[in-house]
């Protein structure tokens, strides 16, 4: 499955992210982490998906996320993982909807990973082979970035 996304590594491009997502009532979110630090934050609206590289954006990216998410709800899968890291950066979303918890409450399946939920409810096969790849390396490959964007696309 191909995923269209914008990879954001410089502060100048954050204004485009803001313009695209500012009117959205909620934002689809996922993260990729390396050594207890957020490397990527994937953000999606109705149309666009953005991958913010916090290793490149640094404090500017963190401040941007604090401001954007403080007034937005987020939707994601297994958000307790993402929230642990977001909170450690002082990023506190306005509201949270976790599709893993929703799946558990519905009780239609006994497995609740994104891979299992996507297959059960959407009939989509997700390859999670890159989940444990090296997110801390200096340059991420196209396959890693596509993998990162895919979770947001599926949850959306």
Where are these regions (language model features)?
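Acidic, Mg2+-coordinating catalytic module of metal-dependent nucleases/exonucleases
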Residues: 126-156
């Amino acid at each position: 499955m191909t995923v269209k996304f914008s990879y954001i590594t410089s502060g100048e491009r954050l204004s485009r992210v803001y313009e695209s997502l500012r009117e959205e009532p909620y934002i689809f979110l996922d993260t990729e982490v390396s050594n207890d630090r957020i490397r990527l934050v994937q953000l999606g609206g109705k149309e666009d998906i953005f991958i913010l590289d916090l290793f490149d954006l640094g404090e500017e990216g963190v401040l941007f996320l604090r401001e954007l998410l403080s007034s937005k709800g987020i939707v994601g899968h297994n958000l307790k993982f993402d929230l642990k890291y977001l909170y450690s950066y002082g990023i506190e979303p306005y509201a949270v909807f976790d599709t893993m918890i929703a799946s558990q409450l519905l009780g239609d399946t006994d497995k609740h990973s994104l891979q299992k939920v996507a297959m059960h409810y959407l009939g989509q096969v997700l390859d999670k082979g890159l989940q444990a790849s090296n997110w801390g390396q200096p340059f991420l490959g196209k396959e890693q970035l596509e993998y990162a964007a895919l979770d947001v696309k599926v949850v959306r």
